[in-house]
Design a protein with these regions (language model features):
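Nucleotide-activated donor-binding/catalytic signature segment of Leloir-type glycosyltransferases, i.e.
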Residues: 220-238
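Short alpha-helical donor nucleotide-sugar binding micro-motif in glycosyltransferases
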Residues: 237-238, 245-250
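Conserved acidic donor-binding segment of nucleotide-sugar-dependent glycosyltransferases
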Residues: 291-300, 308-313
Length: 345
């Protein structure tokens, strides 16, 4: 089958975050099943991401010579009336924008309007979680139920990378790892305030923050104001090999986000057999029901969740085993076959 992928998300792990990972792994898994995948991305890069996305969509030509066209998120909205066009949403922009402010809120609002047109025009809609599917119907007024195909992870490659890495460097430290783009909805500020509460309760605590984004500078400033030097380390964007090392070394993975359409980082943490502390919000409980889930936006609740794992090695081990078993259902070959079934309906 010849499949055309449309995406203006940067296919670069340093810029594209989870969306990049999901599309890249899906394309590779489909190729390994024998399908031909052509990925169209912007040829012109602009300093304003929304302008870049709009320009990319304006330049899209009708599909010719393909059995199927899949547009990710808002991409493909102008040609979505073509027969068999599929809108595949990694998240729901109209849901994400609720948590943003200022220019980010304005530009994401424009993207959300395009995404709404995309799902209303497409022949089929695929979402990554039941939560995401419900938001598509609620926020975009889609009458039909979207098909749900979860995010995926290439476990063979991931585990090979973990096995080939260096020995963990924790050296007696209790390392709490966050990975993600630094948007307001990720609530890294809550993690920083939790770190203040935990310093006296976990003397060997270190919080390591991987990722960049609009909130990077304000978060660094907040960490300085909270006097978290020596407790919190901002790593910025990292290479894939360094990312693997961060997961290997981590004692606990933490995702305090209040909005996730799925959360590929949760799959990465499970693949690395790490216990997880996360917010009981959006798609997170659906993806990691075995994790330590806490009420969102509460620094003390998050601190207690992290401390509970610190004080219970047995619980950590049990959660690690549960995650390592659960992540098998998201392995790339299996999910790629589910995706094929969805586009064939």
């Amino acid at each position: 089958v010849r499949i055309r992928f449309l995406t203006s998300t940067p296919l670069d792990i340093r810029r594209g975050s989870g969306t990049y990972v999901g599309i890249a792994v899906l394309a590779r898994a489909l190729r390994e099943l024998g399908h031909e995948i052509a990925i169209e991305t912007p040829r012109v890069r602009l300093p304003v991401y929304t302008a870049e996305r709009l320009l990319f969509n304006r330049g899209l030509k009708p599909s010719a010579g393909f059995d199927c066209t899949v547009g990710f998120d808002m991409d493909g909205y102008r040609i979505a009336t073509e027969a068999g066009h599929i809108a595949a949403l990694k998240g729901v922009i109209a849901d994400e924008v609720r948590f943003e402010r200022g220019l980010a809120r304005l530009t994401m609002g424009i993207q959300a309007r395009c995404e709404r047109l995309h799902v209303l025009r497409a022949a089929r809609v695929i979402a990554t979680s039941r939560y995401c599917a419900a938001q598509v119907r609620s926020l975009y007024g889609v009458a039909r139920e979207p098909l749900v195909v979860p995010e995926l992870i290439d476990l063979a490659r991931w585990r090979a990378a973990l096995a080939a890495g260096r020995a963990p460097r924790s050296a007696g430290r209790f390392l709490v790892l966050f990975v993600g783009r630094l948007y307001r909805r990720k609530r890294v500020d809550v993690l920083l305030r939790a770190a203040v509460a935990l310093r006296g309760r976990i003397p060997e605590l270190e919080v390591r923050i991987v990722g960049n984004g609009p909130c990077a500078a304000p978060l660094r400033q907040l960490a300085a104001e909270l006097k978290l030097h020596g407790t919190v380390t901002f790593l910025g964007d990292v290479s894939r090999s360094q990312l693997v090392e961060e997961y290997r070394a981590a004692s606990v993975f933490c995702l305090p986000s209040v909005q996730e359409g799925f959360g590929i980082v949760l799959l990465e943490a499970m693949a690395a057999a790490k216990p997880i502390v996360a917010s009981r919000a959006a798609a997170i409980p659906e993806v990691v029901p075995h994790a330590t889930l806490v009420e969102p936006d509460g620094a003390e609740a998050l601190a207690r969740g992290i401390e509970s794992l610190y004080r219970s090695p047995g619980n950590c081990a049990a959660q690690s085993q549960a995650g390592a078993a659960r992540v098998e259902q998201f392995d790339a070959p299996r999910v790629a076959r589910l995706f094929c079934e969805a586009i064939d309906r």
